[in-house]
Amino acid sequence: MKNWGSSDSGGSEDPPQEDSCLDPLDGDPNSRPVPAKPHIFPTAKSRSRLFGKCDSEEASMDCSYEEGQLASCPAITVSPVVMIPKHEDGPTCARQPSQDSVTAGSEKSLKLYDRRKIFEAVAQNNCEELQSLLLFLQKSKKHLMDSEFKDPETGKTCLLKAMLNLHDGQNDTIPLLLEIARQTDSLKELVNASYTDSYYKGQTALHIAIERRNMALVTLLVENGADVQAAANGDFFKKTKGRPGFYFGELPLSLAACTNQLGIVKFLLQNSWQPADISARDSVGNTVLHALVEVADNTADNTKFVTSMYNEILILGAKLHPTLKLEGLTNKKGLTPLALAARSGKIGVLAYILQREIQEPECRHLSRKFTEWAYGPVHSSLYDLSCIDTCEKNSVLEVIAYSSSETPNRHDMLLVEPLNRLLQDKWDRFVKRIFYFNFFIYCLYMIIFTTAAYYRPVDGLPPYKLKHTVGDYFRVTGEILSVLGGVYFFFRGIQYFLQRRPSLKTLFVDSYSEMLFFVQSLFMLGTVVLYFCHHKEYVASMVFSLAMGWTNMLYYTRGFQQMGIYAVMIEKMILRDLCRFMFVYLVFLFGFSTAVVTLIEDGKNNSVPTESTLHRWRGPGCRPPDSSYNSLYSTCLELFKFTIGMGDLEFTENYDFKAVFIILLLAYVILTYILLLNMLIALMGETVNKIAQESKNIWKLQRAITILDTEKSFLKCMRKAFRSGKLLQVGYTPDGKDDYRWCFRVDEVNWTTWNTNVGIINEDPGNCEGIKRTLSFSLRSGRVSGRNWKNFSLVPLLRDASTRERHPAQPEEVHLRHFAGSLKPEDAEIFKDPVGLGEK
């Protein structure tokens, strides 16, 4: 028996099938050409994977024949045998007529094929309809990749059509099409053919097989030369807001990873035909790890599969390419997968990457968290600060703090360890002292500004001549300092807007303090211009700058938790409740003012003021004002008095239709003074209750921005001196060298997870060299307080700065050993003996 696609040529004892009879040959049957062997399934394993048969049992697509039976058939001269498989009864053997048998071939009609007929056959899984396709192509000297067999709009081929029309996970026309393409020397072109339209551009049969989660077809395509680096970069596969589509990183490996198919991922990376490049990037520079971060959506199920796949690919990459730092690769925006998770607000993926601790010895260098020691519920962890601290470009802290206000989970991400403790460390060691000093300087500036404004000259036109008196010297000095402060705030605002380029929403949500300081500086500069242009209106600009200057004092409340949260609530109520109230109120005010001013007539009853209007102006030096209210401005002022409860229903008598006039005023009072004001009060109370926790997180974000701004104002040498953490040895690199990391120690308490699965543990808990020089933190929720544990000490790193100058920093080695085995409940009896607690 000769199995179709098998490499052996042994005979078969089974009789041939009726529909597999070969065409007769001229001359001696023994001299006929040997049938060509297709190579769709080069191994028995691949053949059985697709059809469930092996060499021991004839598969449904095998062809059986005996050479001796060919003599009974009439013979004509034909070209070599080509076998075309049938779905039900096994393959039939079709032959292309040679040029010497044109007369014999003309007696039989040649079946014609076009794109529509081929597409219908593959869509219906109809192999019988395609039995003569190879003969037709060879006769007409055409290929399946010719333009007449493609969709003119999308470039779709018959193979892509077959891949899109699977029946129970398979389509028997696919191996048939591949064999036909092999016989016509177009196999590589057919397998790697892709869509050409702008929407699905670049999608190949391999992409479709992966998307359909069909391991057998993926294997078949890769065995036959499918390009594992083909990029699907059509509009459907791009991340575009408001447009349907699915971004997965363009490459087949990324598609398998983003659709949670670990088996296909391993096959693409480890197959012997064409292994995929694990570090390959798409058109925007994203690797497979970047693509996983992009598809994360912060839901529980999605985060679970993304983090699991991320971990598997990271470990697999380390085993295949030990020296490759896959997680350190950046995209075209300069973002690593960690920075991308922070930029896009993927808090679940961010927390996993920051707190990843791998126990396998050969992959432990991939960890970013190392458990130094554990004692009961107490854990001392070392966090790798690479890509986190501000010493590096596009650090996680900068990405989160300076990201857009539309970034989801922006405030919550700063609560993830070690970010939370790292910011607190920076604040406690040096930032708060600088911040309080700046607060003092600003208070002094505002006092000088206020004094200079209060004692301004009032006689004559500016600029005023200097009187050589002590008071005038102090006044002019105060004015100069006030102007210099305005110039400083102006250029600081320009620098902020150029660096951050905030959107309009970000400007009002996150940058309101910077915007107010900038407006204050504009009023101050306007004051200077008007002053030297001989306009007394400079006073108006000056008082606006003065008022905004004292209002901006709220910026420094972020240095105090309670006051900072209170300031955030004020901001939120202004932007949310008060803005909506003012919009509705102005509509009512303008509408009723136009109605009232229409009723008022000038000159009517002017000579007869009423007693109710006169009694308000009795007294020495008082006189009745002009009783004309036939202007929108004066009417709006009177109606505003009704809003605050100071209005008079008889503020004028110059109107017709008194009943209509009174009804308008009463309706206005009910809608504004009674309804709108009380609604505003109720909404403010509800806002305070709703945003209490949110306000605390916003305050922490504001303080984080202040910390980073203060750090950025330092010189480079000063940044290194005040850097948090220590350089520690945490293990060994894959090439056997010492693995030094800049680490930050955080001590935690966890009453649910004990030290049964700790991979790295120190023999002497809490007695580590350098722990006295590294901050231990007082963690209020689930953390160890440095004041409550004996061997913990809080020594500011500022004290270390001078020591570092005198003694160059040397890498500090922390001896970490593997905790072999795991503790079981029944092993707890061992610890009743103090000796069982370990070596001391």
UniProtKB/Swiss-Prot annotation:
Major location (coarse): membrane
Any one GO molecular function term: phosphatidylinositol binding
Subcellular location, record wording: Postsynaptic cell membrane; Cell projection, Dendritic spine membrane; Cell membrane
Sequence positions that bind Na(+) 2: G645
Annotated region described as Required for PIP2-mediated channel inhibition, given as residue ranges: 779-794
Residues bearing PTM Phosphothreonine: T371, T706
Sequence segments annotated as region (Disordered): 1-43
One annotated Gene Ontology cellular component of this protein: postsynaptic membrane
Keywords annotated in UniProt: ANK repeat, ATP-binding, Calcium, Calcium channel, Calcium transport, Calmodulin-binding, Cell membrane, Cell projection, Glycoprotein, Ion channel, Ion transport, Membrane, Metal-binding, Nucleotide-binding, Phosphoprotein, Postsynaptic cell membrane, Repeat, Sodium, Synapse, Transmembrane, Transmembrane helix, Transport
Membrane-topology annotation of the record: Multi-pass membrane protein
Comment on protein domains: The association domain (AD) is necessary for self-association.
Record family assignment: Belongs to the transient receptor (TC 1.A.4) family. TrpV subfamily. TRPV1 sub-subfamily.
Protein name, per record: Transient receptor potential cation channel subfamily V member 1
Native source organism of the sequence: Canis lupus familiaris (Dog)
Gene: TRPV1
